[in-house]
Amino acid sequence: MIEGFYFFSGRGMDSGTTVYAKNRKTSGLIGRLNLVSHPFCILLIVHFCMKDYSTPFLTRFSRLFKMLLWLFSTVRRIRRLDKASVEQRNAEFSAICAEALSILNVRLIASNRPSESLKGVLVVANHISLLDIFAITALCPSSFIAMKELSRWPVIGRVARNADTVFIDRSNRKDINIINEAICRSLAEGKNVCFFPEARTSSGNGILPFKEALFQSAIDAGSEIQPLALRYFDSQKRRTTQPSFSEVNLFVSLWRIVSMQEIEVHVDFLPLEKPQGDRYEVKDKIEAAIGREVGKIHEVLAE
């Protein structure tokens, strides 16, 4: 839910969305907008009704323009990695994602990061924002498990395919077995594989229930699991949900990110886990560990 707004749509996004505001300045019906034809209108409304005006309007558009250039540059850079080694690919992807975070003025803070590079581990993290993948890849380059719909996104889908992303149809249980086999092969080749067991994004103040299916791959491959806990803070070092991709569309999520003066993403590396027991037991243990870390609320961090 966007601060200051409720979005309602009777017949879906293609038919338009009625937007209401709940603050005094924009009370009542603002208008009926077609999100497909006029996504820019949504961005303007969010801009004028967001509480944080610290980032100039031109700075926001500058960040968006630089991200567009970054995206097309990334497509070219990834094409050159076809014959690269795992180490070379990891180094390049780490650099690519660090550049994206820099453009968006996102500070990456890692805690308890292993001194040696991880190889052949299953990386598991809570999912909050579009920035999660950039943050994780900058620190721990991995192939990602993503929803099948992402493969159809313009440009981004192409980048994801070239980055060895494995796409999954969660409605097809047979597809889960195929994905687990693919993960096992990647782990055996010394590649890291990352997935978000919540299966969707949360606000970031807690975690959603984990799905157990893909934990089977670590058991079958005999690979260790690296749990990661992600938390976001604003320029005042207060916990924030603004970067969250939960319940908003891509345009609004990206606009909220570029509108923040500065973002801090804290990535806590929890102790490596050797899977023991069945996938349900493994899931429960990892879920509890990440949940405890994400649930640590600090209004103001120590300097």
Predicted regions and their residues:
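Short hydrophobic targeting helices and cationic amphipathic motifs
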Residues: 6-8, 15, 29, 35, ...
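Short, low-complexity, charge-dense intrinsically disordered segments
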Residues: 19-31
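A transmembrane-helix-recognition feature enriched in membrane-embedded lipid enzymes
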Residues: 47-109, 158-162, 260
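Catalytic core of membrane glycerolipid acyltransferases/transacylases, capturing the structured
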Residues: 70-83, 102-104, 117-173
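A cross-family acyltransferase "interaction/gating" segment
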Residues: 157, 205-284, 300
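Catalytic-site beta-strand/loop segments enriched in glycine and acidic/polar residues
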Residues: 186-215
